[in-house]
Amino acid sequence: ELDEGNGLRRPVCGEMAELLACPLVNLPVCGTDGNTYANECLLCVQKMKTRQDIRILNNGRCRDT
């Protein structure tokens, strides 16, 4: 789901993230926290653990700054 205005995408967090049972799929995404996650589900798990509003900055690995 794309946010209007800032271009950041909200991760789609389903049951698997709630159960902490993410698939072993390597489709990296870059979170707004600056971390690269192996897939969207793992970003969701981190989002739930930290209770932060982590969104998807871009598909693929985060760029080194």
UniProtKB/Swiss-Prot annotation:
Q: What does this protein do?
A: Inhibits chymotrypsin.
Q: Where is the Kazal-like domain?
A: 7-64
Ordered alphabetically, the record's keywords are:
Disulfide bond, Protease inhibitor, Secreted, Serine protease inhibitor
**SMART domains the UniProt entry points to:** KAZAL
Organism of derivation: Cairina moschata (Muscovy duck)
Quaternary structure per UniProt? Monomer.
InterPro entries to which the protein is assigned, alphabetical: Kazal_dom (IPR002350), Kazal_dom_sf (IPR036058)
Its recorded name reads Chymotrypsin inhibitor
UniProt subcellular location: Secreted
Question: What main location does UniProt list?
Answer: secreted
